[in-house]
Regions:
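Structural signature of outer-membrane beta-barrel domains
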Residues: 1-6, 101, 112-116, 188
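Transmembrane beta-barrel strands of outer-membrane/channel proteins
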Residues: 1, 98, 107-111, 135, ...
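Repeated loop/turn-to-beta-strand initiation elements of outer-membrane beta-barrel proteins
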Residues: 102-106, 190-191
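Conserved small-residue
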Residues: 1-86
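Generic recognition of flexible, low-complexity loop/linker segments
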Residues: 82-83, 92-95, 189-191
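Hydrophobic, lipid-facing positions within transmembrane beta-strands of outer-membrane proteins
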Residues: 90-96, 103, 178-183
Length: 194
């Protein structure tokens, strides 16, 4: 984006006032997926989040880094920065065909290299999960429970508190997908077909 107008600035301000909580129009549920933000010189596929230094072993709370470089336990939408970009550096397709004694195999693949993703599934299934339903085992095994413990996920707190967009859940995404596989046999040369 080269330049933003007042309407886009107003949209950013409106998202900031929601404190990182969004509402899914289809399910009418709260979600904490990073919002699209409009900023001059930034990609439309940029992932905006607050920088995280991980889980504090002493308290079990997430430790954030403000825009000014200060440590804090408080998530603030004003501290969001670009922590990744969903656009991959390289994408492409390739495939191969193989024929042998009447058998044939045709495949095609898609690849993407570089780029990041915000792992919303991990946020929803571990940190923002509803303990009354089936939950990921990491809810019990990966969370902070005692002082001095190094943990991947913060301690269990008030169920109304949601993990907001944080760099802890921005992950590199490179993948290879098999998009099609066709296996065949040519029966025209079989005796029973003649």
């Amino acid at each position: 984006i080269k330049e933003i107008n007042e309407a886009l600035t107003s949209m950013n301000d409106s998202k900031d006032s929601d404190k990182g909580l969004n509402y899914d129009q289809n399910t009418k549920e709260k979600t904490t997926k990073p919002s699209v933000r409009y900023a001059e010189g930034q990609s439309m596929s940029a992932i905006w989040a607050v920088r995280s230094l991980g889980i504090d072993p002493g308290t079990g709370n997430e430790l954030f880094l403000t825009k000014d470089g200060y440590l804090t336990y408080t998530w603030d939408s004003d501290d969001q920065i670009v922590c990744g970009d969903e656009l991959p550096k390289y994408t492409g397709t390739f495939g191969f065909n193989l024929d042998w004694k009447g058998f044939s195999v045709n495949t095609s693949f898609y690849y993407r290299l570089g780029g990041q993703m915000y792992n919303q599934t991990l946020v929803d299934k571990v940190e923002n999960c509803d303990m009354n339903y089936n939950v990921d085992h990491r809810v019990y095994t990966g969370r902070w429970t005692t002082p001095g413990q190094k943990a991947e996920f913060k301690k269990m707190t008030d169920p109304n508190y949601f993990t907001r967009p944080t760099s802890r859940f921005v992950q590199d995404l490179s993948e290879l997908q098999m998009t099609s596989l066709n296996i065949g046999y040519d029966f025209r040369n079989c005796k029973f077909m003649q």
